[in-house]
Every structure is written in structure tokens, then in C-alpha cells.
């Protein structure tokens, strides 16, 4: 047995011992993900739950005067007109993220008051609200770093059999997450272990990316060593 083969045996044995449970978990969680994804609010759901604009005809400015407020050089991908605490607001999806501008440039952006919070929640679930938590840090169901700008975030619990929860941004009342008990259960068996979606790790995008890359690299090295040992 030459030196390279001995090295490959050692690499395969050590990495196999360390990573076997991880790879078994990754393999089994992939089956769960074929039927259950990580709960997220889709763009279609958001469109369906948007507050109704006044049918009496709110006075809206010319769209060119609104786009003139965008930073120079920004390219607009899509535009949504919605109500923010009763005020018409344009949301522009751009190359620099989503930018929000009230139709009336003379007023400041309103805060999300209790009345608007409850009205928005009712659009998502008709059951009574049992509790509202004010979050100042990310949790397991909103572990993404880009949501930090929405802080504080309101977590709303509904009194229904499904265990429904809704997360709303305090900045504009946008729904950030909407899930029930069943979706959260399957996420623990599928998406969370498969994508390493643990809050403490996923909220740090750089660390999470490096962790996934290193685990992938070590897994590939283990497989290559195993193939070498088999062929040799």
C-alpha cells in the first residue's frame, strides 16, 4: 500500500466518522423537503393580502415625480402601489433593494399603530389574536440578516387550531413570515437541518455561507477519498 492510498484511507475514515451523521441527516431531510419547504410568504400571497385602495379615487402624483426621488443610477425591476397606515405608498424593487416612497411627499412615513396592525393581521387570518410580541432580534422563523432593517418586528399569535403565526414589519406593515404549526414541524425535520437554518448561524450571512462551503468541501473530499480506496 503506497503513501497516497494510506492517506486516502485515513482521510476517508476520519471524515467518515465525523460527517456520517451530518450526511445521513442531510440525505433524510432532503426527502422531507420534496413535500415540505421552509415556510415563506410568497409574492403572490402578499399581493392577495394587500389592503384595498380607496375606490373614491385617492389623489396620486404622476409616476415620474415619484421615480425622481429614487437615487441616481438605480434600476427599477418592479413597482407596487399599496397602503401604509392608510396612506398610498409606492414600493420599488430595485438593484439596491426595495425602496418605499409615500405618494404624498409632504408627509413623513407613518408608524404602524395598533389599529393598522390589527387590520393587517385580519387580512391574513380571521381568528382572534391571542398575543403580540415585539421582536428586536431575529428568531428561528425569520433568521435572515436582511430582515434586521425591519426591526422591531411584530410576531402575532392567532387563536386557531392550526397554531398560525404572522410576522409584520414595523416599518411598513409588510408580512415577513406566515406559518402554522404543521409547517414549522416539518421545517424542523426538513429545511432547517438541510440548509443549516439555525438562527445563530443563518443571521450571519458570511459565516453561514463559509460554513456551508467548508462542509461541502469536506464532504467532497471524503467521497473522493472513498472512491480512491474503492478503485485502488
Language-model segments: residues:
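Conserved histidines in hydrophobic membrane contexts and catalytic metal-binding motifs
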Residues: 1-232
Amino acid at each position: 500500500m503506497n503513501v497516497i492510498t494510506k492517506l486516502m484511507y485515513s482521510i476517508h475514515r476520519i471524515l467518515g466518522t465525523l460527517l456520517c451523521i451530518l450526511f445521513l441527516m442531510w440525505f433524510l431531510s432532503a426527502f422531507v423537503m420534496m413535500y415540505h419547504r421552509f415556510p415563506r410568504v410568497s409574492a403572490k400571497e402578499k399581493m392577495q393580502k394587500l389592503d384595498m385602495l380607496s375606490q373614491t379615487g385617492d389623489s396620486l402624483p404622476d409616476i415620474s415625480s415619484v421615480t425622481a426621488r429614487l437615487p441616481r443610477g438605480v434600476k427599477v425591476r418592479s413597482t407596487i402601489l399599496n397602503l401604509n397606515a392608510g396612506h398610498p405608498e409606492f414600493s420599488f424593487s430595485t438593484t439596491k433593494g426595495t425602496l418605499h416612497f409615500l405618494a404624498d411627499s409632504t408627509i413623513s412615513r407613518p408608524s404602524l399603530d395598533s389599529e393598522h396592525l390589527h387590520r393587517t393581521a385580519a387580512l391574513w387570518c380571521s381568528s382572534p389574536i391571542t398575543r403580540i410580541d415585539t421582536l428586536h432580534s431575529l428568531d428561528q422563523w425569520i433568521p435572515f440578516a436582511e430582515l434586521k432593517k425591519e426591526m422591531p418586528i411584530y410576531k402575532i399569535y392567532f387563536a386557531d387550531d392550526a397554531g398560525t403565526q404572522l410576522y409584520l414589519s414595523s416599518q411598513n406593515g409588510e408580512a415577513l413570515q406566515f406559518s402554522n404549526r404543521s409547517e414549522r414541524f416539518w421545517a424542523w425535520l426538513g429545511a432547517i437541518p438541510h440548509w443549516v437554518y439555525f438562527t445563530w448561524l443563518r443571521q450571519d450571512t458570511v459565516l453561514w455561507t463559509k460554513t456551508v462551503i467548508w462542509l461541502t468541501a469536506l464532504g467532497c473530499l471524503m467521497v473522493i477519498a472513498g472512491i480512491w480506496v474503492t478503485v485502488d
